[in-house]
């Protein structure tokens, strides 16, 4: 039987720019492919670019990077069934593993040791109907939830979702992140930036312990830079 393979867009070592691990050195494994076309997507190159690699070769490359923190991302990593083999291989070697997913696929299939970061799509994203509603039932304290906010309507929707799903206390953290300017291309519509100061005011007025999240890596390197 041949070894499981995954379509990999890139593997790189950088500063984690999001989540409660923000600021830490991290190895990133970016998988190819995504069924969504969010207007503000900053990794649309991962929709179609990538090469098949064995799980063993992926783990070997990660082992050469000077960190025990690994994030599996995309694209949408859960569209590739063998991603679960990769998760288990990394976890079994003692890595702390994060996976970022849109929640479009069943998150309950993920190894219980992993930290799931669920990026729930808002109405203005262009993919609001993509979330698998049963995933709310599987959320746990090991998880984090992120909403990328494009405007006040998005904020209000995300706030209501946070309340109705009782996310505060159910997950490790709830992040609200402002959209950064994104040019459109043949795959995505593009988006205008939301002022972080504006979002900060909305978060403060909410009275909830929501985390304002800025993409740290985009303040270090050019926003369109790859491999960071």
Regions found by a protein language model. Name each.
Residues 6-13, 25-28, 36-115:
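Conserved Radical SAM active-site core
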Residues 20, 41, 50-53, 70, ...:
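Short linear functional motifs in flexible/disordered or boundary regions
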Residues 1-32, 36-40, 205-211, 220-222, ...:
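Flexible, acidic/Gly-rich N-terminal and inter-domain linker regions that tether
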Residues 78-228:
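Conserved AdoMet/S-adenosylmethionine-binding subsite of the radical SAM
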Residues 32, 74, 149:
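Conserved residues at beta->alpha junctions
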């Amino acid at each position: 039987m041949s070894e499981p393979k995954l379509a990999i867009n890139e593997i790189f070592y950088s500063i984690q720019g999001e989540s409660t691990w923000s600021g830490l050195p991290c190895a990133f494994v970016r998988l190819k492919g995504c069924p969504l076309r969010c207007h503000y997507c900053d990794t649309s190159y991962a929709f179609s670019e990538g090469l098949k690699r064995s799980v063993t070769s992926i783990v070997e490359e990660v082992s050469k990077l000077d960190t025990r923190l690994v994030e599996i991302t995309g694209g949408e990593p859960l569209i590739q069934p063998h991603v679960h083999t990769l998760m288990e291989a990394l976890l079994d070697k003692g890595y702390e593993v994060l996976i970022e997913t849109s929640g479009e696929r069943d998150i309950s299939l993920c190894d219980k040791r992993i930290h799931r970061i669920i990026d729930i799509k808002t109405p203005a994203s262009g993919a609001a109907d993509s979330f698998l509603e049963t995933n709310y039932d599987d959320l746990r304290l090991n998880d984090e939830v992120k909403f990328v906010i494009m405007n006040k309507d998005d904020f209000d929707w995300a706030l209501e979702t946070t309340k109705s799903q009782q996310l505060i206390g159910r997950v490790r953290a709830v992040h609200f992140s402002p959209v950064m300017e994104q040019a459109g291309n043949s795959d995505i519509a593009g988006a205008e930036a939301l002022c972080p100061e504006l979002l900060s005011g909305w978060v403060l007025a909410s009275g909830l312990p929501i985390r304002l999240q800025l993409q740290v890596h985009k303040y270090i390197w050019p926003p369109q830079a790859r491999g960071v």
